[in-house]
């Protein structure tokens, strides 16, 4: 959508627009929560990045409690990257992270993240629900087999 594109263009120079970006983001989140108070539909989009993000957070630790830890938002931001299916959008998102001084790599053992994710509250035994973004301004909730998690995390089949 053109509205999503405008927001994204503004975020490519976040230092010039940070207050507007934060205000608009909070307004959007508030509307989503108010329109889906019981998490029956649209509110699921707010889980974008959290499934992998919580795994990163569990392994890396939270800044303040662990010296080299990351903030919750940094973990979620890193967890968003593998969920973006459009590679050019991944590159643009990484560029924005760099501009904001956010990490673009986790620096953690992906197998440890995988192990944590296999016990995530959004998992139901052999499947887990993740939020994927096929392109700018659109998302979908996917129930994927746990066996797809290694590939999603970029773990090679024979990697230990």
Predicted regions and their residues:
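Active-site segments that bind and position negatively charged phosphate/pyrophosphate groups
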Residues: 10-111
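Short, small-residue-biased leader/transition segments that mark boundaries at the very start
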Residues: 1-8
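C-terminal charged capping/lid subdomain of soluble metabolic enzymes
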Residues: 91-160
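Short, solvent-exposed coil/turn linker segments
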Residues: 9-10, 36, 139, 145
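A structure-centric signal for secondary-structure junctions around beta-strands
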Residues: 4, 42, 125-127
């Amino acid at each position: 959508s053109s509205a999503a594109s405008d927001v994204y263009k503004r975020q490519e120079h976040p230092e010039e627009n940070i207050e507007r970006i934060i205000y608009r983001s909070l307004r959007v989140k508030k509307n989503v929560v108010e329109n889906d108070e019981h998490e029956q539909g649209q509110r699921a989009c707010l889980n974008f990045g959290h499934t992998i993000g919580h795994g990163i957070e569990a392994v890396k630790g939270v800044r303040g409690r662990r010296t080299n830890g990351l903030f919750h938002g940094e973990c979620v931001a890193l967890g968003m990257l593998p969920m973006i299916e459009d590679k050019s959008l991944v590159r643009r998102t990484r560029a924005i992270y760099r501009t904001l001084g956010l990490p673009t790599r986790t620096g953690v053992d992906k197998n440890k993240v995988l192990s944590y994710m296999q016990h995530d509250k959004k998992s139901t035994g052999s499947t887990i629900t993740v939020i994927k973004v096929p392109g700018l301004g659109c998302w979908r909730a996917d129930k994927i087999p746990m066996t797809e998690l290694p590939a999603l995390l970029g773990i090679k089949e024979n990697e230990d």
